[in-house]
Amino acid sequence: MSAENAAQAEKVFPPYFETAVAIRRKAIKVYRFMKELLATVKENKRIAEGIWAITLTLPESVGEIKGGQFANLSVGDSAYPLKRPLGICSAEGNDVTLCYQLKGEGTHLISQKEAGEKLSVLLPLGNGFDLGNAKNVAVIGGGVGIFPLAAVVRQHAGAVNFRSYIGFRGKQYACLEDVFSKGGSLTVATDDGSMGMKGNAVGAFLSDYNEGAADLIISCGPPVMLRALKEALKERGIKTKCLVSLEERMGCGIGACLVCVCKKSDGHNARVCKDGPVFDINEVEL
């Protein structure tokens, strides 16, 4: 927008112009803490039915990546300009592994990328999980929601004792069990009972719950799972702090487009990509 057009817009639509400027300034502020890089595909493989893991080698360091943060990855096709938000499963040196589910043309195109190809990636995005001083953490993940949780367990294994409860639709969709088992105890649940206990991750957690056993609960999964968890904690009077990572459709990844807005318990809105994706379970409506 030229200076002349901007001035005209400010006169005609002052409230809207001020909002747009404020969002733009906030977006620029966020950019200081992340980088858009041209990464090289190191490995791209199927790890379960419809689930893939792509490892990218970054040309430079992006600093510390917290478990629960995510990346916006280009699909490598000009016909699909929007980057896809993918969970960061691990970060070692300049190698970053993103896990994703084949769901639509964009992720299908990503799955076809081979070692040596270049892809634009914007990272790290979001706030991630802050474990604070917690030493005993209950982990509850469902489906693709286990990806950011796996990064947390990897990052803190040895320093924190994790009790993980992860759920899948069936055995064919199970993945990353080795990561969670290295962090502590692991219970797997499947909807059809083909692996582990029959049921879901929330049910597995509740059946094993002992008061005082966890300093903190962290969770990520589909909205129906998070709602069930929130209701169960309330019904059982469980006061342990619970942090959840929300799954929402995203556009820009920096809080400017407002596609991923969620409602907070106080009536205000929050942008999942910038203000989250991790929130206290009692601070957001699910």
Region roles according to the model:
Residues P223-V224, E247-P277:
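Local cysteine-cluster metal-coordination motifs and their immediate loop/turn environment
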Residues F13-F17, Y31-F33:
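Aromatic (phenylalanine/tyrosine) cluster motif
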Residues A3-A6, E18:
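Short hydrophobic alpha-helical segments enriched in small aliphatic residues
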